[in-house]
Swiss-Prot record:
UniProt keywords, alphabetically: Ribonucleoprotein, Ribosomal protein, RNA-binding, rRNA-binding
Family affiliation: Belongs to the universal ribosomal protein uS4 family.
Lineage: Archaea, Methanobacteriati, Thermoplasmatota, Thermoplasmata, Thermoplasmatales
GO cellular component terms attached to this protein's record: small ribosomal subunit
Keyword Endoplasmic reticulum: no
Known function: One of the primary rRNA binding proteins, it binds directly to 16S rRNA where it nucleates assembly of the body of the 30S subunit. With S5 and S12 plays an important role in translational accuracy.
GO BP annotations listed: ribosomal small subunit biogenesis; translation
Biased composition (Basic and acidic residues): 165-183
Bilayer-spanning residue ranges: none
InterPro entries, per the entry: Ribosomal_uS4, Ribosomal_uS4_arc, Ribosomal_uS4_CS, Ribosomal_uS4_euk/arc, Ribosomal_uS4_N, S4_RNA-bd, S4_RNA-bd_sf
Region described as Disordered: 158-183
S4 RNA-binding domain sequence ranges: 106-168
Protein name: Small ribosomal subunit protein uS4
Superkingdom, taxonomy of origin: Archaea
Length: 183
C-alpha cells in the first residue's frame, strides 16, 4: 500500500553541464570528502536546496504570523539542530547561510574519518560498506548516512570486526600517525 510505483531521482543535475568553475569546485569537494561520484555531491546539494527553499517559504509566511508556519519553523529548526547543522535558537537566516560543506560534514563517512577510525576518507568509506562500523549498536553500511547529534558519540567499530583489536596492524599504524601529528 505504501510502496512507490516508480522511483524518483533524489538529485537534480546542474543546469549547464560544462561550467569550468563549477566543475573545478565539485572536483575539490569530491577529493576532500571522498565521494564516489558527482551524483553523491548533487544529492547533498539537493538536500541543502530543499532546506533553503523551505526556509524561504517560511520566511514569507511568517510575515503574516501564520500559526502553521510557526510550527513548521520549529520543526525545521528542530530537524537541523538534531543533525547538528544549526543550534537550538537558530533563525531562518542561519538556515539560508548553510552551505554544501555543512551537509557533507554530517555524513557517516566524514565522521568516521574525523574520529580517526580510518586513515583516509576512502578507507572510511570502505570500512562502512564492509560492515566494520556501527552506529547506536547497529551496523550501518551506507556512507552517506546522515548522523544525528545524539548518534555521533556512538560511532565505533563493529564487535565482529577485526579492527576492534588494539593490536591490529592498522590500528597500530593509526595510533602511530596520531602520535606523529601531536609532535
Amino acid at each position: 500500500m505504501g510502496d512507490q510505483k516508480f522511483q524518483r531521482k533524489k538529485y537534480s543535475t546542474p543546469r549547464h553541464p560544462w561550467e569550468k568553475d563549477r566543475i573545478d569546485a565539485e572536483r575539490q569537494l569530491l577529493i576532500k570528502y571522498g565521494l564516489k561520484n558527482k551524483r553523491e555531491l548533487w544529492r547533498a546539494q539537493t538536500i541543502l536546496t530543499n532546506f533553503r527553499t523551505q526556509a524561504r517559504t517560511l520566511q514569507a509566511k511568517l510575515r503574516y504570523n501564520d500559526p502553521l508556519a510557526i510550527k513548521q519553523f520549529q520543526l525545521l529548526i528542530g530537524k537541523l539542530s538534531r543533525l547538528n547543522l544549526l543550534g537550538e535558537n537558530a533563525t531562518l537566516d542561519d538556515v539560508l547561510s548553510l552551505n554544501i560543506e555543512d551537509i557533507l560534514e554530517r555524513r557517516l563517512e566524514t565522521l568516521v574519518y574525523k574520529k580517526n577510525l580510518a586513515l583516509t576518507m576512502k578507507q572510511a568509506r570502505q570500512f562502512i560498506t564492509h560492515g566494520h562500523i556501527k552506529v547506536n549498536d547497529r551496523v550501518v553500511t551506507i556512507p552517506s548516512f546522515m548522523v544525528e547529534k545524539s548518534m555521533e558519540d556512538s560511532i565505533t567499530y563493529n564487535e565482529t570486526s577485526p579492527f576492534t583489536d588494539e593490536n591490529h596492524p592498522l590500528r597500530m599504524e593509526m595510533s602511530g600517525t596520531k602520535e606523529e601529528e601531536n609532535e
